[in-house]
Curated annotation (Swiss-Prot):
Binding positions for GTP per the UniProt entry: D101, V102, R103, S104
Protein name: Nucleotide-binding protein BLD_0430
Annotated region described as Disordered, given as residue ranges: 1-35
Organism (species): Bifidobacterium longum (strain DJO10A)
Function: Displays ATPase and GTPase activities.
Amino acid sequence: MNQQTTNRDTGEAAATNAPANSATSTSTPDNQPTPLDAFEVLLITGMSGAGRSHAADCVEDMGWYVVDNLPPKLLIPLVDMMTTSGSGSESGVHKLAAVIDVRSSYFDELAAVLGHLDDLGVKTRILFLDASNEVLIKRYESVRRPHPLQHGNRLIDGILEERHLLEDLKERADWVIDTSSLSIHQLSTKLYEAMLGSGPTTVAVHIFSFGFKYGMPIDADFVADVRFLPNPFWVPNLRELTGHDKPVADYVLSSKGAKEFLDAYEKAIEIALEGYAQEDKHYVTIAVGCTGGQHRSVAMSEELARRLRAHGLNVTVSAREQHKRHSS
């Protein structure tokens, strides 16, 4: 998935005439303001090449007003303008999404700006797009463009510098999405699930199966290892099937320890989800791994999803290694 460049208002011009030191909504009979506690700000950030621009497109489709490469110091004047002018109320837009990267001016002021927005009662969330160094290198090489922090050095040097600069922001993020193995369509789906699939007291759950032989996932909140179960790969009539097929699912789920593991894991997940909802975390990723990601992990992922859906949870399932076959 190559990051596409989009052209939007940069926000500087929009904020030029906004009061710089006030974000207090005022009202006139013909021009009603948007209350600050009804206004939302989303920061879209992350590694260059990880899909920020596509994420911005998706967020725009969800009804957010999107501004590209906005210097953090202009966030408050822009929010002030959109709330005090009444333009937000007239247009029905109460949500501002700003794409911010390390090239934005005064990036180090972002923490103070976020604190100010919190003090004003503006709901502010952070979406962080990430990808492995290897994938970022391949994406940059495919488009033959330099990294914004490369400065004539090696591509990996620019990537590592950016990763270091974004460490604190990643820690503060409400959503961290790793796009290393995602297509544009899969990223869109994941964004919609994360941002629209949950309410203020519910948590959207995404479960995916994977193979340990292809690497550990880096974006999972929970990782379950089901390699303790008998491997259908070594059963001749099951080898060419996957955990989506009933014979494999029956074999895996009837194995010694499968039910006991699912019972315990289901209970642990329920407890964690209740806590996450209280902490305003609305999206949880569960990875279930076996050796090759074809049999045991797929069957167990589907069964875990079925159980969680029975509790009324919004659960989606995918198989990371679905295009890889003949693997245990």
